[in-house]
Amino acid sequence: MVRLKKSTGIETLSPIHRIDRETAGLVAFSKRPQDRNAYQALFRDKSVKKIYQAIAPFREDLQKRFPIHYQSRIEESSVFIKMHEVSGDPNSDTWIDIEEVRGQWARYSLKLGTGKKHQLRVHMSSLGIPIKNDQIYPVLQPHVITNKDFSEPLQLLAKELSFVDPISGLKHHFFSSQALHL
């Protein structure tokens, strides 16, 4: 954040939402402190359409179920930094579809209905298709807590954001130029 403020010269720059540190792609920022809450409210109120891409194993037995509307209840687990599914009313939902298949891997489109911590990672892992290079799901790798290893990045990309601007009323649709390749 410090480097971004220095490179743009905008000291008031602040993120209006969060993505996991390991996730690549779009993050929206607010320049004016007086507008920040209005933009953050869009995310709190689920008024932002968020689309991600992920590379994960292809499972032929799931192919006929796509698109899948996956819902579950996600809560913090007893394991540091890890979330898990528990019984109860769903508090998270994701639409999952296949974009492309190449051998044992597929690129998936993930549309968030909610934005729980690690939601996409938990949902994909629960379906038996954990995101490629995920060092937390399904099994927490020992070095994750003490030493972040980015040599094999998580194959999860925040690809699109769209919303109606709460200040101007204009419709915005932002795309990441990054892409995940099979």
Language-model segments: what does each one mean?
Residues 1-182:
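RNA pseudouridine synthases
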